[in-house]
Amino acid sequence: MTPTLAPSSRVQLTDSGKLRHFLTTEHLPRSLLEDILDTAASFVDVGGRAIKKVPLLRGKTVVNLFFESSTRTRSTFELAAQRLSADVLNLDIAKSATSKGETLLDTLRNLEAMAADMFVVRHQDSGAPFFIANEVTPNVAVINAGDGRHAHPTQAMLDMYTIRHYKGGFEGLKVAIVGDILHSRVARSQVHALNILGADEVRLIGPKTLLPVDAEALGATVFTDMAQGLKDVDVVIMLRLQKERMDSALLPSEAEFFRLYGLNNDKLLFAKEDAIVMHPGPINRGVEIASEVADGPRSVILNQVTFGIAVRMAVMSMAISGQDSDMSAAGGAHGQR
């Protein structure tokens, strides 16, 4: 896993402590993470209304900058922005000027000239959203939609929302994160968020070849045995094998991985009877999770997707609000770029 890329609380927060950018869960105050969850709770029912919109970002422009493909994540960000009444621009990186030699910085400057208010950034390189946040003008918010192996903070927060929804809080909870921890930006963000929110214990379970050397330094207990790692946990979060990021030598075979670390009903018996099962998606059935579990009564995977829209609405609205208040405090007029 990648080390901290910047003093993240200073980059992400306004002088008054409001959200300015959302780049990582690391080092953020507990009160802010709880504010995100509380704000998301107010948006959950929007999807069930006849008119699925609130006017909080009316007149704002959100640009999705996805340098790494992800239909699911981009779609939920797009839907979240639309439900906030924002205008949304999806930049096709493969056909954009960046693929023709224009630098990332030049692309940003051109988008800023179009009066963009927010960039949602997904990039294959760790740290790219930090770079963008440091380069944009003060009235543009940046949301990290996943960067390299480093962080995926909105995924972590929708997972935190799901846990709080089903468990009522975090105190006393034992949470197991299972699978390809080494390549998972989601796992890193989850560990930070769980520790900040007061979980009793965070466990990382996987083969030694797929566990980062700094796992315990993150504030997690490491297990290589599923029976020991799942014993009496309240939440099981399964992660997919990121074969596109790994050397084949790290994994004997998918069948062997499933035998040892795939979650089926037999292995789930080691967890508490009321333990919930989560997965950030996409799911590889028969590799990290059996269909009997993914589709079973303890699975809350589909609800994670539903909650994800509300959480991203919360983050986007809070970041824009923080930017606007920061500009007002500085005496600047929003729109001067």
From Swiss-Prot:
Pathway: Pyrimidine metabolism; UMP biosynthesis via de novo pathway; (S)-dihydroorotate from bicarbonate: step 2/3
Documented EC number(s): 2.1.3.2
List of residues binding L-aspartate: 100, 185, 240
The keyword Ribosomal protein is annotated on this UniProt entry: no
InterPro entries xrefs: Asp/Orn_carbamoyltranf_P-bd, Asp/Orn_carbamoylTrfase, Asp/Orn_carbamoylTrfase_sf, Asp_carbamoyltransf, Asp_carbamoyltransf_Asp/Orn-bd
Reactions this protein catalyses: carbamoyl phosphate + L-aspartate = N-carbamoyl-L-aspartate + phosphate + H(+)
Gene Ontology molecular function: any one: amino acid binding
Keyword Ribosomal protein: no
UniProt KW keywords: Pyrimidine biosynthesis, Transferase
Gene Ontology cellular-component annotations: cytosol
GO biological process: 'de novo' pyrimidine nucleobase biosynthetic process; 'de novo' UMP biosynthetic process; amino acid metabolic process
Pfam families (alphabetical): OTCace, OTCace_N
UniProt: carbamoyl phosphate binding residues: 72-73, 122, 152, 155, 281-282
Biological role: Catalyzes the condensation of carbamoyl phosphate and aspartate to form carbamoyl aspartate and inorganic phosphate, the committed step in the de novo pyrimidine nucleotide biosynthesis pathway.
The family this protein is said to belong to: Belongs to the aspartate/ornithine carbamoyltransferase superfamily. ATCase family.
Complexes and interactors: Heterododecamer (2C3:3R2) of six catalytic PyrB chains organized as two trimers (C3), and six regulatory PyrI chains organized as three dimers (R2).
Protein name: Aspartate carbamoyltransferase catalytic subunit
Species annotation: Alcanivorax borkumensis (strain ATCC 700651 / DSM 11573 / NCIMB 13689 / SK2)
Lineage: Bacteria, Pseudomonadati, Pseudomonadota, Gammaproteobacteria, Oceanospirillales
